[in-house]
Amino acid sequence: MSWQQRVDDALTARRATDTLRRRYVVSQGAGRWLVANGRQYLNFSSNDYLGLSQHPQIIRAWQQAAIRFGVGSGGSGHISGYSVAHQALEEELAQWLGYPRALLFISGFAANQAVITALMKKNDRIVADRLSHASLLEAANLSPAQLRRFIHNDTQHLSRLLQSPCVGQQLVVTEGVYSMDGDSAPLAEIQHIARRHHAWLLVDDAHGIGVTGDEGRGTCWQRGVKPELLVVTFGKGFGVSGAAVLCSESVADYLLQFARHLVYSTSMPPAQAQALSASLAVIRSDEGRERREKLAALVQRFRAGVNASRFTLLNAHSAIQPLIVGDNSRALRLAEALRQQGCWATAIRPPTVPVGTARLRLTLTQAHEACDIDRLLEVLHGAGE
């Protein structure tokens, strides 16, 4: 088979199963409204849960830092790219979340891959929730360690897998809030099981940090859990981008030596780090609390309305509210029907989610108003098959 044939066959297979991904060009993709092709839509696809991507205080912090530092960091943090803005943000994050150290990464994908590939060795075992993010599972597959996957949120299955003999070390991997299902992991029980088997715990709290817990400290803080490795990302609740790993002093020093994604990548711009510090300040303030409370009320309003209709929701009380459709083509038709009525929603299909669970992944944000939720419910009820 030639290179071209391989490429063509892969694309043909995606088209045949209605799983071909497409990008849409938008003029504005975050906030209450999405603008595309000159038309304005209510935006139910953004991960900007607290509406901070448009916050004037955060925008101003980025602008002022760009004037001071320029628009790029100039290199890896190991060369010349670790500025006072990066250092300040790491210290603020560590203090906020109660860890000795925080290390910044350019993305959550990079952070997850860096930690797993740097730590895991031959004869080690990774035990991951089967619905863990692609960055976690890909890192596990690329590492020399054995990967075992436990049934989603099934702590008994997790315990059985950890009980089987392992020559090396074991790492349990889960998420705080699951990106496609919107539900939460039983973190306290998972941590108890991991410690009983002398395993370390890695929690990716991309969709919980900033949005849940006291001062927005996330799902782990809310559940009284402190994993050995906590990954937080900044493209959701923080409204910016990037990520950080929270850990001990020795693990941070180890990652600075052996995490290739950290050593060999240009660090985030200092202006971005300063904007993230400004975002953190908002998240921790009374304004941040009010934004979280408003979002929680909108989620409750949506779930109450959908539960009275023909749609069935998953047990998700986060900003992520998936409507399981099942069939790929039906999910695409439903997304298009909503767009025709001025609501932008995204159809999520395999391989992002398991076969037979195609869905609309609806996301609610603090930028929405109650009337927006009511409009979405009205359109959904009219579009339901």
UniProtKB/Swiss-Prot annotation:
GO molecular function: 8-amino-7-oxononanoate synthase activity; pyridoxal phosphate binding
Keyword terms of this UniProt record: Biotin biosynthesis, Pyridoxal phosphate, Transferase
Binding of substrate, residues: R21, H133, T352
Pfam family, one: Aminotran_1_2
Catalytic activity as recorded in UniProt: 6-carboxyhexanoyl-[ACP] + L-alanine + H(+) = (8S)-8-amino-7-oxononanoate + holo-[ACP] + CO2
Pathway: Cofactor biosynthesis; biotin biosynthesis
Modified residues (N6-(pyridoxal phosphate)lysine): K236
GO BP annotations listed: biotin biosynthetic process
Quaternary context: Homodimer.
NCBIfam families in UniProt: bioF
Protein's UniProt name: 8-amino-7-oxononanoate synthase
Organism: Salmonella paratyphi A (strain AKU_12601)
Gene of this entry: bioF
